Amino acid sequence: LPIGLDTQIPKKPYSVVLSVSDKIDTLVGFFGINEKPTSSKDPFALRRTALGIIRTIIENKKNFKLNDLLSYSSSLYQDQGYNLTNQDLQKELHNFLKDRLKYYMKEKKIRFDIIEATISSFSLNNLFSSFEKANQLNKIINNQQGIDINSSYKRASSILDNELKNSEI
């Protein structure tokens, strides 16, 4: 669980932990041997697996220390004698999960500029917090108060730009 954007997610604490741990293990294993999705192929459904991690964390309103989980999972493979050949494993998984979070936010109708602003300060350890900030900002900007604030900002910015241009002449 979950296996898609609209499927059920685990809700009980042990189920949540088990689901996230299992999916982390899957991603570390495949990325560790350089079996990653390409732009056209994802034979092991790794995008769906990453989306499952993201949905489980966000919809249960939890922050996991995913960086620690990724490191620990990688060390478990090493301890069992498996040689993970991918030297950029942590970085690639961080970027992969970041891309999947962007996709998830887009599917939740969060504005592109808000997604980009959120992703610029993204941390795997605060995945839920990152999403929640973007979601709240999206709600504010899309209501009348946000529209008024944005309009006032644009007007003030335009006035300042004109003043700067006139003072340079």
Name these PLM-found stretches:
Residues 1-169:
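Amphipathic alpha-helical "coupling" segments that flank catalytic cores
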